């Protein structure tokens, strides 16, 4: 490897650390790293615990290996190699699990989608894939109310009001540990959801009682089948669109900061908070806003298929990641189709929850092998 380049980088880091307060452990670690790769290392103390505490993954293994080789500590070197072999085997099992389950689900999804296509060509308007082009919700409000709910209830509250409020009270999430950041994510999202739903309620209150079929929750219907079936079909569709999308963005996709935190988290409490946020709170709030309110409202101005596409695009745009608009629009279209066919928000909420849960589980399994 480029040892000289690495040593130069560590020396530069050491210089900058000496100018900072509360950086003593990192200063000691930098000194150890520089000394370990010298031709004749002179270690003033036993740095094993310092390395184990401050380095992770491959960096910890490589540094400890160098330390034990310098010390000629063959017993510890053998133990380290055995540990790394066990970690490597565990990582292989996890990668197989992460890769196999979505592939199996995708295969089932492709089969289900092909079956639905054949049924559509054979049965026509009686098929599950058929969309009643004349279907429209009775919508007493106009486009001004639609924009009011979206702009004020979703974008303004989430992107302007809440950040300003947290900044005003001096709350900086960057200074928190992982548990603190997890709680911050949950509190900020739930606050946005409650505020958004309150604005939705106040905006629609003048039109009470609402016409039939608005915001339907039917727990005794077949919503579970619609949710699971929609999830299986979404897997291959979103995967194909994502692969195409990669070509446009040269692999430089956006990223939800929640996913990055979840990748680092190996704390049950933190993961539980992330699960509540992504797999419970987000599906409930976003399905009420985008499938429960926006999609039906748009049927006043366009056919049902147009409302599904338009609401899906707004849903994707609301995630504020330009490079992920195509995959998220595809997911939104599946969510919209499931909702319009089932006429039950529980179905799209289940699909949404399964999607987010699958992402979190994959990141947890990947992150658990990083230590």
What is each of the regions a protein language model found here?
Residues 1-208, 363-371:
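N-terminal, membrane-interfacial amphipathic/helix-forming hydrophobic leader that caps
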Residues 113, 161-170, 195-203, 233, ...:
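Alpha-helical membrane-inserting segments
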Residues 131, 164-189, 202-281, 369-371:
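Juxtamembrane helix-loop-helix connectors linking adjacent transmembrane helices
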Residues 148, 186, 224-228, 272-276, ...:
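Hydrophobic alpha-helical transmembrane segments
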Residues 192-196, 274-277, 328-335:
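Hydrophobic core segments of transmembrane alpha-helices in multi-pass, intramembrane catalytic enzymes
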Residues 284-289, 293-294, 321, 354-358:
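Active-site His/Glu-centered metal-binding helix of metallohydrolases
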Residues 288-307, 340-344:
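Membrane-interface helix/loop boundary segments of multi-pass membrane proteins
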Residues 305-371:
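Functionally important transmembrane alpha-helices
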